[in-house]
Amino acid sequence: MLFWAAHLLLSLQLAVAYCWAFSCQRTESSPGFSLPGDFLLAGLFSLHADCLQVRHRPLVTSCDRSDSFNGHGYHLFQAMRFTVEEINNSTALLPNITLGYELYDVCSESSNVYATLRVLAQQGTGHLEMQRDLRNHSSKVVALIGPDNTDHAVTTAALLSPFLMPLVSYEASSVILSGKRKFPSFLRTIPSDKYQVEVIVRLLQSFGWVWISLVGSYGDYGQLGVQALEELATPRGICVAFKNVVPLSAQAGDPRMQRMMLRLARARTTVVVVFSNRHLDGVFFRSVVLANLTGKVWIASEDWAISTNIPNVSGIQGIGTVLGVAIQQRQVPGLKEFEESYVQAVMGAPRTCPEGSWCGTNQLCRECHAFTTWNMPELGAFSMSAAYNVYEAVYAVAHGLHQLLGCTSGTCARGPVHPWQLLQQIYKVNFLLHKKTVAFDDKGDPLGYYDIIAWDWNGPEWTFEVIGSASLSPVHLDINKTKIQWHGKNNQVPVSVCTRDCLEGHHRLVMGSHHCCFECMPCEAGTFLNTSELHTCQPCGTEEWAPEGSSACFSRTVEFLGWHEPISLVLLAANTLLLLLLIGTAGLFAWRLHTPVVRSAGGRLCFLMLGSLVAGSCSLYSFFGKPTVPACLLRQPLFSLGFAIFLSCLTIRSFQLVIIFKFSTKVPTFYHTWAQNHGAGIFVIVSSTVHLFLCLTWLAMWTPRPTREYQRFPHLVILECTEVNSVGFLVAFAHNILLSISTFVCSYLGKELPENYNEAKCVTFSLLLHFVSWIAFFTMSSIYQGSYLPAVNVLAGLATLSGGFSGYFLPKCYVILCRPELNNTEHFQASIQDYTRRCGTT
């Protein structure tokens, strides 16, 4: 398939060549376009600019027009001549071998195709012949240098590819030419646009420009460059508000350019990237000046960044700031002097073709004969950089030929050289040229660097300043931003955004199709904005919190009722005092156990009551400090059980007094049965056992455990136990309420008992304090769930225990210690007799 495709291509080439043959021969030419040698190199240079017009016939354009001379191409033309002469004069490179050349002016696509076919012509002939094996093709040149732009290079590379003839371009930078399947013989000494596009995007990012316009020139260079820029910039957060291509035949101010300027103005972008060749760029910027598009930042691609074409546009100084990417500045030593000597040598009219020789079309430069040392084209920085690329390209071919001919021994072998053999060697070259390494990767691309430049209008004439550099593989920018003179006030960096950045903690809500246009919304509480994802708020971790509109999460404060907090110290002191009073009362009652006061209070039953209050008091210590499993298991159940035992004893004590004084004579059988069967003890045991069963069920089914509570307060972690408001807790509490009511009823029935046995008021006070304390606790727990809730629980428990102690035991302690005269049998008998008389009178 490839064989027939190659033959089809050759047939087409032959046909075109024959169609042009009769119109291509010249009778005169300029000296310097050809040089005989052992091996010939071809060079394609644009000594004249093409006339941009539509052609209807495939005729070769005559480049030698008086109004189209291209000084830049002239310098590159001279650079190749100079380099070949320098190599021929060298004894280290290609000794005993002389290089020659054939140079062509390729001002148009047709002249470029013609020159390429001339290069492919068989050695010793002026035409191509059909061949079965292209590997044996022997053309009169072994390699080709050029051409100067992507469009021409694509054509030339496609024609040379079947023959594998090396094509080393000095200015064609399009990434499409790196494809080795289509262009296996293409190499270049200018970096690929792949890197240029990366450098431009990095340049935009370094200044925070995310809202841009893209303009390209018609053709592969501009259109592919704009496409690559958009594809690379969009994933990096840069939005393209406007994109267009300058038409091939456009003129400044024509309707098409006016529409483009209008759309560019409406895009409201401060930064415009112009990826264009220097020829169409002039049309674009003349239109920019006519439309008065000022105050912008223009980013230049390397083809026009330091070209003198654009600065010569009238009014260009007012368009704004121009930054650009340029090939690294290098000098070709001796080139300027070489051009001056050439001018002196060719001064005069073109020569006539020698009889019998072939002078190819577009090997003529009439302007070159009119130059003097005073009016010759100025060799500026732009042309010098490109000339160095030509210099490097010729040296790369020479080194490849040096290796192929085995010249390392001091002499070179002579014999036929096929282009494909030379191509293999050129890929392998690796040498130093004026301290710069020359080598190619597997795609034929060189090692290289870019300069970052800024235009400077401070002086009387246009200049540019190198403000930074860009290294490749990987791409790295180094920019001195202080060197840039911005067009805005106070030399401030212009801003180019659709929407200004949101405040910290505000995420972007995209509006429309461009992600650079958005509204700013605050992040909700508990979320934060991560700088790596500006469109979505991220939730904080479990142990973290964030207020509304936050850019970071903060660690939650862990809170619990600590031992050393002021409120804890107060409660601990009060509870310890109560505990000491309970123990002291137990000791006092043991000392005065057989006195009437202790016996009337219940005798030995008082120790059970005091012990239950001590258990409840001890349980309150487990509310302080970090909750632990033992503390959670003991604190509420132990308190509840202790107070239940106390209430059971208090209830049965009140009930016994009522039976003794009111029902012993009325219902003697019940009284004797109750007394003989130890009814009081049975009741206390049964009641306590029931409550113990409830507590065990509570612990088994709703086991209190330490937990970290995150929901109540966004910025806090509350360490607590899970027993609060659990079903087990409420059931146990309900049992205590039932006992409290029973105690109140029994004490109320005994309100008319003898004074020393009438405890209705004291018991009522104790129970009232109990009810009020726990009502206050449940009310507080329903509205407050903070770290001080255990303190409220302790306070409620302390009030309950204090109420029980002060209501029942404290009056008796007072009598024992302060009124011993009332603690005797006679006083109690008198009180009973008084009660009997009152009952008898009623």
UniProtKB/Swiss-Prot annotation:
The gene is Tas1r1. It is a multi-pass membrane protein. It comes from the Eukaryota. Residues 1-19 form the signal peptide. One of its GO terms (cellular component) is plasma membrane. It comes from Mus musculus. SUPFAM superfamilies: Periplasmic binding protein-like I. Its main location: membrane. The lineage of its organism: Eukaryota, Metazoa, Chordata, Craniata, Vertebrata. Disulfide bonds: none annotated. This is Taste receptor type 1 member 1. Changing residue 418 to Y: In strain: 129/J. Keywords: Cell membrane, G-protein coupled receptor, Glycoprotein, Membrane, Receptor, Sensory transduction, Signal, Taste, Transducer, Transmembrane, Transmembrane helix. PROSITE patterns: G_PROTEIN_RECEP_F3_2, G_PROTEIN_RECEP_F3_3, G_PROTEIN_RECEP_F3_4. GO terms for molecular function: G protein-coupled receptor activity. Changing residue 244 to D: In strain: 129/J. Pfam families: 7tm_3 (PF00003), ANF_receptor (PF01094), NCD3G (PF07562). Residues 20-568, 626-640, 703-725, 784-789 are extracellular. PANTHER family: CALCIUM-SENSING RECEPTOR-RELATED, TASTE RECEPTOR TYPE 1 MEMBER 1. Residues 590-604, 662-681, 747-762, 811-842 are cytoplasmic. Changing residue 347 to T: In strain: 129/J. Changing residue 443 to N: In strain: 129/J. GO terms for biological process: sensory perception of taste. Glycans are attached at residues 88-89, 96, 136, 292, 480, 530. The keyword Transmembrane helix applies. Putative taste receptor. TAS1R1/TAS1R3 responds to the umami taste stimulus (the taste of monosodium glutamate) and also to most of the 20 standard L-amino acids, but not to their D-enantiomers or other compounds. Sequence differences within and between species can significantly influence the selectivity and specificity of taste responses. Changing residue 281 to A: In strain: 129/J.
